[in-house]
Amino acid sequence: GSPVFIAFRSSTKKSVQYDDVPEYEDRLSLSENYTLSISNARISDEKRFVCMLVTEDNVFEAPTIVKVFKQPSKPEIVSKAPFLETEQLKKLGDCISKDSYPDGNITWYRNGKVLQPLEGVVVLIFKKQMDPVTQLYTMTSSLEYKATKADIQMQFTCSVTYYGPSGQKTVQSEQAIFDIYYPTEQVTIQVLPSKTAIKEGDIITLKCLGNGNPPPEEFLFYLPGQPEGIRSSNTYTLTDVRRNATGDYKCSLIDKKSMIASTAITVHYLDLSLNPSGEVTKQIGDALPVSCTISASRNATVVWMKDNIRLRSSPSFSSLQYQDAGNYVCETALQEVEGLKKRESLTLIVEGKPQIKMTKKTDPSGLSKTIICHVEGFPKPAIQWTITGSGSVINQTEESPYINGRYYSTIINSPEENVTLTCTAENQLERTVNSLNVSAISIPEHDEADEISDENREQVNHRATLIVGIVLRLLHGALVAGVVYWLYVKKSKTASKHVNKDLGNLEENKKLEQNNHRTEA
């Protein structure tokens, strides 16, 4: 359009004259050195301004071009996709920068590297809009992107490049990281809890996992011997498992049954059968076979206990004795399986009728005699003494402890004449009576040996075994010496026979010679 005068200043007048130009109203200032300032710059101020110097003789002009710049806002990624899918071209988002003048350019970056358009993989759509009022530009760049698994945790950014008074500048956006969806490529199955050994009665949970993102929420579970899968979430629980649950367990994707995983489960078991068991009552001398049978998924250890004391071997009774009575426990366990133990008990009661043996001995002082009634039987027999004849009783019925069905009662007596002592032993099975004649204290008599107690029996047996061993060694030595001596004597006799034979031949020769001489004469 036509030039418009906007300001005038005379060298002779100090005042400034501004023309009536509405768009510059109250925005112009012309200084004494003829510098024109425009406040509150606008895009419309981008024009050609001319400074004119008018003199009496001539007119001088000095034109200049005014450029207006507006820095755009920091770019921002908006309309972001909630996730990206592999092998699918999908809109990632829009990068927008507002209020720019002049307009700028937008660039996308993946992990700091510029994204260049690539058909079917990277699609960029750029557009700009100018506000009709402010004449400022808004730039928008849309990015469509086909993601791969390599884009997991990758940083996407964008920048705007614009021109300012000092040249080209760039402003970066904040980074954006997108969740990458990808299909399951492998299925795995787990057994929970993750202990190594499973026993009967346990609760186990099968957990199926797919390595896709997001992971599958439903699977098909296949139990041993069942061709049809059971549809469930990613877990399937088995309660109170039994030994017949041992086998291969599988799971697969619902929509892709060929993608399957399997695991082998062994349910360990342990059975124990004790025969007989519970409380068993037998008679002394009876035979009692005892068996503890084990059935287990692995080799099991077996321990026998009697009255809380571990036995070296399994009990076997060909002829029951009172000391065989007690509480027997057969216990077994699988060492590799925690908590898998079984035990059965046998309470053995050995009963017997009372048996009595009586002995007597004279006190070294010669003033009293001790009579002992040895009793064995079970239940414990009660002992009762009776005396026939006269005599003074010094100390009556002192009893020993009842051990292994045996005990004894002693009575000390100083009879002035011959007496008979009777010992009666009685339990629920029978009443047994035995008597012993005891001479008067003044009459010496042969003492009978005491019954060997159970505590001393083992020591005596050990000593007897030792003595027998020594005697056998002595006999062996004597036998060897005898054999050597016999061989020596035999050899000596043989030599003697040879000498005698030779001597006899000499004598016979002499006689023959004498006879020959006589014949010749």
Curated annotation (Swiss-Prot):
Residues 507-521 have a biased composition (Basic and acidic residues). The chain crosses the membrane at residues 466-487. It is found in: Cell membrane; Cell projection, Axon; Cell projection, Dendrite. GO terms for cellular component: axon; dendrite; immunological synapse; plasma membrane. Residues 500-521 are annotated as: Disordered. Residues 488-521 are cytoplasmic. GO terms for biological process: adaptive immune response; axon extension involved in axon guidance; cell adhesion; heterophilic cell-cell adhesion via plasma membrane cell adhesion molecules; neuron projection extension; retinal ganglion cell axon guidance. Residues 63-172 form the Ig-like V-type domain. Residues 183-266, 271-347, 354-439 form the Ig-like C2-type domain. It is a single-pass type I membrane protein. Disulfide bonds join C95-C158, C208-C251, C292-C330, C373-C423. Glycans are attached at N33, N105, N244, N299, N395, N418, N437. Glycosylated. The CD6 binding site is located in the N-terminal Ig-like domain. This is CD166 antigen. It comes from Canis lupus familiaris (Dog).
